[in-house]
Amino acid sequence: MASVEDPGLYVLDYVPNASAQAIDEVGEQFFRIIRDAHPEVPVVFIEDVIFPHTIFDNKILEEVTKKNIAQKRLFKKLKKSGEKRIYYIFAEGMIGDDGEATVDAIHFTDLGAMRYVDHVLPVIKRALRCH
């Protein structure tokens, strides 16, 4: 990602495929590689989706919550260190809670994809305007 020439924006939406431990251990290092290569490029951090079925599965809810807390902790640490042009997108309200946003409780339907875009696009637009 850091080798991309003239990027306009980085969107870090890795939380669904990472563990809280991995975010804590290598999240900042990953960010620094990108930031060192492109110090002026905005970076958007996105939380993992809280899927509606998690009200029935405390184990998954706990795992997703831990990962999102780790992501937020990383973001706050970067902000506190003086990082500029970083943005954060919370999971709350991302895809709705009616169960219609996924085909299998994980993968988005067209409606889920639309809701996701509607949720993240305003932050991406703001990041690009400020760049």
Go through each PLM region and give its residues.
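Short helix/strand-capping connector loops at secondary-structure junctions
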Residues: 93-103
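Extracytoplasmic/secreted proteins, especially bacterial periplasmic and envelope-associated proteins
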Residues: 25-29, 33, 70, 115, ...
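A short helix->loop->beta-strand "cap" motif at the edges of active sites that frequently abuts
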Residues: 38-43
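Histidine-centered active-site loop/cap adjacent to the catalytic His
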Residues: 104-131
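The substrate-binding groove and active-site-proximal loops of carbohydrate-active enzymes
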Residues: 13-22, 58-65, 103-111
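Oxyanion-hole/transition-state-stabilizing segment in secreted/luminal serine hydrolases
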Residues: 1-37, 48-54, 100
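Substrate-gating cap/lid alpha-helix
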Residues: 51-89
